[in-house]
Amino acid sequence: MIQAHRFKAHKALNFDSWAEARTHGVTATEVANASTPAGFRNLVDSYGNPPEPYDNPYMAFGRKTEGPVSEWLKERFGIFPNEWLISHDNPIYMATPDGLSLDHTVISEIKTTGKDFGDKIPIGYRRQVQWQLYVTGAAYCVFTWMLRVETRTGEFQPGWIEPKTIKVLPSRDTIEGLIDVANRLWDIKQELLGKNGEK
């Protein structure tokens, strides 16, 4: 079980607190995005020049779909929706998986896509999930995706009756590489936090 002190902030209960807590560590999204040289540079640039918040129909469809898919995962696998930012024993390693079983041994991650992933999920998502597995200590992740199709009126709707899933196990080699990325990111974050504190 994940100890209570590792549940840092709840996204739905207090978004600002959740967002603030994320700045004091390195998240799964950050590690996944920074795992290539170009991605690392882009993410570091964004620390100094945060992009303006934006939204689009693809993101809106993803938010709309996540609720029903979360309920399906709860009924099918006993994985409950999660909004908690969770830390590793090392508190700078953080993640907010989309779902968490009651015994904390299984997590889920939900995506929507315009193209079926088939039997191999995209590398960026695999890295994100591996980091979530490392942070939570879960035995595996039920990676879940729903196809997005466009209607004649230009609206998006689910393309399947039920989502598809793949069971993802931890990969020690992948995780070790992600730890290195996270440590390098954290060094830079600390530098920036220190500079901001001096102002």
Regions from the PLM with identified roles:
Residues 1-2, 193-199:
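Short intrinsically disordered terminal tails
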Residues 1-64, 68, 76:
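Charged, glycine-rich intrinsically disordered N-terminal tails and low-complexity linkers that flank
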Residues 17, 47, 77, 104, ...:
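Generic low-complexity, intrinsically disordered sequence content enriched
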Residues 59, 77-190:
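Nucleic-acid nuclease catalytic cores
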Residues 66-70, 126-129:
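Short, well-ordered alpha-helical scaffold segments within catalytic/effector domains
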